[in-house]
Amino acid sequence: MKKIIACPRTFSSDALNVLLKLTSKRSPKTEKTEAHCRKYIQALAAKNEKPFPNPEKDVRQPVEDCSVDGMQTFVWGISTDPDQPVILYLHGGAYMNQPVSFHFKMVSHIAAGIGAKVCFPVYPKIPVHDHKETYTKLKTLYEQVIAVHKPENVIFMGDSSGAGLALGFACRMGKAMKSCTMPSKT
């Protein structure tokens, strides 16, 4: 297992505080609840480092499982139409949970409605990884997408924390990643 990044007041520490509050029904933070939460977060971190199962049963069509800069990425709905919309979907889960069936079904339904291809990265999660690593991998994915598709046909989409990640990535691209071509819509 990779080393867990320890930083003062980060998503990792905030997540731990939330878990402590949720697991401490009668009393505030105790050594027992803190140990329980740390064990839970370590188990979650180990689980997040393993490959995610292919979601073909959820999207009901063939799904390519590929690696983009070491980031597992699922792709489906591929067509020969050069103007096909592409949804780059970032799932929610508090930046630390893997996607669930709902994420795949929802984006698949939306994509079918507009005839879009879906790129669904299983992005790096806290507490092992940070936003800088995630943004770097997303930039590589985005560059691969626009090498084949027009930037104006790319749609950044996400739910919950994934929506925040998509918005943050779009803002970061606009400010710090001047070499990237921006999509016309986010």
Where are these regions (language model features)?
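Short beta-to-alpha linker loops that shape the active-site pocket of alpha/beta-hydrolase fold enzymes
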Residues: 122-126
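A glycine/proline-hinged amphipathic helix-loop "lid/cap" segment
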Residues: 1-79
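Short, conserved loop/turn and helix-capping segments at secondary-structure boundaries
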Residues: 100-104, 132-135
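Serine-hydrolase catalytic-loop signature spanning alpha/beta hydrolases and amidase-signature enzymes
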Residues: 94-97, 102, 118, 144
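Short amphipathic alpha-helix adjacent to the substrate-entry channel of hydrolases
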Residues: 101-119
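Short, small-residue-enriched loops and turns at beta-alpha junctions
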Residues: 96, 127-128
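Short beta-strand element of the alpha/beta-hydrolase
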Residues: 83-93
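Short strand-loop-helix active-site module centered on a catalytic nucleophile
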Residues: 73, 88, 110, 131-185
